[in-house]
Amino acid sequence: MAAGPRTSALLAFALLCLPWTREVGAFPAMPLSSLFANAVLRAQHLHQLAADTYKEFERAYIPEGQRYSIQNAQAAFCFSETIPAPTGKDEAQQRSDVELLRFSLLLIQSWLGPVQFLSRVFTNSLVFGTSDRVYEKLKDLEEGIQALMRELEDGSPRAGQILKQTYDKFDTNLRSDDALLKNYGLLSCFKKDLHKAETYLRVMKCRRFVESSCAF
């Protein structure tokens, strides 16, 4: 019985290490269930990484007495709040899979630019020791979502909305209070957006493939 969790962890790690099939013609060779499983695992990994980073940054730079008021001020800060994306599991269940994939793609793409500056901000690895790989992880998830869109749209995806607006760059001047608050807000949005993307992918996976892990 003790081998169960270990086996599950090893399987999850193995799936995370699997690359997406790059050639369009080869996508049908990978079952849809595997595409969804890989996408969900990658989204979960990124969301956890973002949550851990936010907490570490908070502990390192934001006084405990100021956190609550700052978090309230950040409520309307995230760009993702300006697009008509579902805000939770219940709303996500009312949308089609293609809609949820498009929202997921928009959320991921909005961070491709800003995260390239993370390694310059956290050069001491105090907060984000793997920051130089976050861009690669986001690109990997982007490819997985695009693969799912091709599968669900019979290999001929319609021209989707192109995200023109994105988040600001992270500020490298950590001696400035304004810069610290800006980075704190960006990390909060990064965490929220990845949580949304993970939720959308899990909703789609669960309603297509009935599983015991669908309660979340």
UniProtKB/Swiss-Prot annotation:
- Superkingdom of this protein's organism: Eukaryota
Q: Which InterPro entries match?
A: 4_helix_cytokine-like_core, Somatotropin, Somatotropin/Prolactin, Somatotropin_CS
- Which PROSITE patterns does the record cross-reference, listed alphabetically? SOMATOTROPIN_1 (PS00266), SOMATOTROPIN_2 (PS00338)
Q: Where is the signal peptide?
A: 1-26
User: What GO cellular component is one of the record's annotations?
Assistant: extracellular space
Q: Which GO terms describe its biological process?
A: animal organ development; growth hormone receptor signaling pathway; growth hormone receptor signaling pathway via JAK-STAT; positive regulation of receptor signaling pathway via JAK-STAT; response to nutrient levels
Q: Where in the cell is it found?
A: Secreted
Classification via SUPFAM superfamilies: 4-helical cytokines
Q: Does the keyword Lipid metabolism apply?
A: no
Q: Name one GO molecular function term.
A: metal ion binding
- Alphabetical UniProt keywords: Disulfide bond, Hormone, Metal-binding, Phosphoprotein, Secreted, Signal, Zinc
Provide the disulphide bond pattern. Answer: 78-189, 206-214
Gene3D superfamilies according to UniProt: 1.20.1250.10
Query: Positions modified as Phosphoserine?
Result: 131
Main location group: secreted
Q: Which residues bind Zn(2+)?
A: 45, 198
Function text: Plays an important role in growth control. Its major role in stimulating body growth is to stimulate the liver and other tissues to secrete IGF1. It stimulates both the differentiation and proliferation of myoblasts. It also stimulates amino acid uptake and protein synthesis in muscle and other tissues.
Q: Which family does it belong to?
A: Belongs to the somatotropin/prolactin family.
Q: What is the name attached to this protein's record? A: Somatotropin
From the UniProt record, report the name of the gene that encodes this protein: GH1
